[in-house]
C-alpha cells in the first residue's frame, strides 16, 4: 500500500528466482514517507481543481456567451488533465510511485478540494480556533504515534527502507518524512490563521485592488515562495529541523495572504471606501 518502487523491487518475491528490474534513481527519488497516495498528484489535483472551478464560476457570473463558455470549460479541464498527466508520469518515471498511487492522489486531491472549497468557516474562524485546531491535530498525531510505538508498530518503517535502498545516502531527505509533512501542514494551517487575522490583511481587504495590482501580487508572491522553497535546513538536529519546517510553512502562507498585498497597496495608491488614498 505505502511501498515505493525504488525499494519494493529489491524486497518483493514477485519476480521469484529471476532478476529484479533495474530502476534508475534520481536526486528526488528517495522520498522517505509512504507512497500512497501520491502527495504531488494530490496537491496538483487540489490546486488545479480550485483554480478551474473558480475561473468557470467567474465566467458564469460575467454571463459569458454559451459557446465561449463551452470552449473555456473544455479547455480548462483539458489543461488540468494535461498537467496531472505530466505530474503522474514524472512521479512513476522516477520510481517514487506506482500508477495506482498517483491515481489515488488525483482522486483524493479532487475530493478534498471539493469539500474544503464549500467550507466558508475558514475565513471567519478566530485566530484562537486556528491555534487550537493546529495544536489538537499535532498532539493527536504525535500521541497516536507514541501509542502505536508502545504496541511495537513502527510508523517510520519507510525511513529504514529509504536509507537501505537509496543508491546515494545524500539523496535521502528528512523533509519527506511523515513528521516533516505533518509539521509542514500544521504550519500552513497556522500561517493561514495568522494571515487572515493580521491587521495588514484587514487593511488590504478594505481596499479595491486593480487587476494589474492583483497580477503583481501573484507574480511577486510566486517568486518569493520559490526563493523560500530553496531555503533548506540541516537535518542533524531533528527538533530544530521540524521547528524550522513549521515556521517556514507558516511564512509561506503569510506571504501571499498578507505581506505582499499589504506592501504593494502601500507602494501604489488604491481606492478604499470610495476614496483615493
Curated annotation (Swiss-Prot):
Regions crossing the membrane: 39-59, 67-87, 131-151, 215-235, 250-270
Protein species of origin: Haplochromis xenognathus
Compartments in which it is found: Endoplasmic reticulum membrane
Keyword Endoplasmic reticulum appears in the UniProt entry: yes
InterPro entries xref list: P_Acid_Pase_2/haloperoxi_sf, P_Acid_Pase_2/haloperoxidase
Membrane topology term: Multi-pass membrane protein
Family: Belongs to the glucose-6-phosphatase family.
Keywords for the protein's UniProt record, in alphabetical order: Endoplasmic reticulum, Gluconeogenesis, Hydrolase, Membrane, Transmembrane, Transmembrane helix
An example molecular function term from Gene Ontology annotations: glucose-6-phosphatase activity
Active site, renumbered: 40, 97
UniProt name for this protein: Glucose-6-phosphatase catalytic subunit 1
One Gene Ontology cellular component annotation held by this UniProt entry: endoplasmic reticulum membrane
